[in-house]
Amino acid sequence: MMRIALFLITNLAVMLVFGLVLSLTGIQSSSVQGLMIMAGLFGFGGAFVSLLMSKWMALRSVGGEVIEQPRNETERWLVETVRSQSQQAGIAMPQVAIYHAPDINAFATGARRDASLVAVSTGLLQNMSRDEAEAVIAHEISHIANGDMVTMTLVQGIVNTFVIFISRLIAQVVSGFLSGNRDEGESSNGNPMVYFAVATVLELVFGILASIITMWFSRYREFHADAGSAKLVGREKMIAALQRLKTSYEPQEEGSMMAFCINGKSKSFSELFMSHPPLDKRIEALRSGEYLK
């Protein structure tokens, strides 16, 4: 809760300072305050709705099944491993789910540390040793213990807010200038068609650029989740799990859930837009102990 309050206060303070600067430079119009509020509502609103619905959406997207009562030895081992590690990490027991996929993969999601979900693929259970699987589960438990889902939502909310606000502010200035709007009584947005066209293009461009920030933060949290796993089950187990992942198939999970999947192979696309660091970098970070301090 303190983390949420701090992020909201920081975001509000920056927006107020930005509004003051606009006022002093004469750029501010009567609608800027309303634009700031609208950007904040839409920017944070979408991010928090996604967070609150994350467990339901994640299970639905992969066809996951929550284990209510273990039906076999593998499910019993999985539930007991999650229970033991969550106790070690000081969090409430997450829901445990399995989904059918050939990929060696797992993910964690949930709106709160004490109301979370850990899901693993059948491919992981079939193709990893118990030690390797323990390390992967510990990685997901570390995401939960670190509060990464909430933190990523707050970061995404701030980024969304500024993308919406700056895009529409620039669109307002451009459309007003092109329409020759100089009278107080006229719409501050100038030509509506120009306004929405410019705002749409800028939101797309700024959104792509802003994703560099969110993906950088996601990669940073992955290193810490790897370190958390090493602390829970041992460095060598986590290294072995990452080495195993180097030979696995690419994961198919998309969107916000992808940020908390264990797999993260380097793709041909720029590393700037990757949610996970390359596996070799993660292994090297564990060996050097960079994030274990």
Swiss-Prot record:
<dbReference type="InterPro" id="IPR022919">
    <property type="entry name" value="Pept_M48_protease_HtpX"/>
</dbReference>
<keyword id="KW-0472">Membrane</keyword>
<dbReference type="GO" id="GO:0005886">
    <property type="term" value="C:plasma membrane"/>
</dbReference>
<keyword id="KW-0862">Zinc</keyword>
<dbReference type="InterPro" id="IPR050083">
    <property type="entry name" value="HtpX_protease"/>
</dbReference>
<keyword id="KW-0482">Metalloprotease</keyword>
<keyword id="KW-1133">Transmembrane helix</keyword>
<keyword id="KW-1003">Cell membrane</keyword>
<feature type="transmembrane region" description="Helical">
    <location>
        <begin position="158"/>
        <end position="178"/>
    </location>
</feature>
<dbReference type="GO" id="GO:0006508">
    <property type="term" value="P:proteolysis"/>
</dbReference>
<dbReference type="GO" id="GO:0004222">
    <property type="term" value="F:metalloendopeptidase activity"/>
</dbReference>
<keyword id="KW-0479">Metal-binding</keyword>
<protein>
    <recommendedName>
        <fullName>Protease HtpX</fullName>
        <ecNumber>3.4.24.-</ecNumber>
    </recommendedName>
</protein>
<keyword id="KW-0645">Protease</keyword>
<dbReference type="InterPro" id="IPR001915">
    <property type="entry name" value="Peptidase_M48"/>
</dbReference>
<feature type="binding site">
    <location>
        <position position="139"/>
    </location>
    <ligand>
        <name>Zn(2+)</name>
    </ligand>
</feature>
<keyword id="KW-0378">Hydrolase</keyword>
<keyword id="KW-0812">Transmembrane</keyword>
<keyword id="KW-0346">Stress response</keyword>
<feature type="transmembrane region" description="Helical">
    <location>
        <begin position="4"/>
        <end position="24"/>
    </location>
</feature>
<dbReference type="Pfam" id="PF01435">
    <property type="entry name" value="Peptidase_M48"/>
</dbReference>
<feature type="binding site">
    <location>
        <position position="143"/>
    </location>
    <ligand>
        <name>Zn(2+)</name>
    </ligand>
</feature>
<keyword id="KW-0997">Cell inner membrane</keyword>
<feature type="active site">
    <location>
        <position position="140"/>
    </location>
</feature>
<dbReference type="GO" id="GO:0008270">
    <property type="term" value="F:zinc ion binding"/>
</dbReference>
<feature type="binding site">
    <location>
        <position position="222"/>
    </location>
    <ligand>
        <name>Zn(2+)</name>
    </ligand>
</feature>
<feature type="transmembrane region" description="Helical">
    <location>
        <begin position="193"/>
        <end position="213"/>
    </location>
</feature>
<comment type="similarity">
    <text>Belongs to the peptidase M48B family.</text>
</comment>
<feature type="transmembrane region" description="Helical">
    <location>
        <begin position="34"/>
        <end position="54"/>
    </location>
</feature>
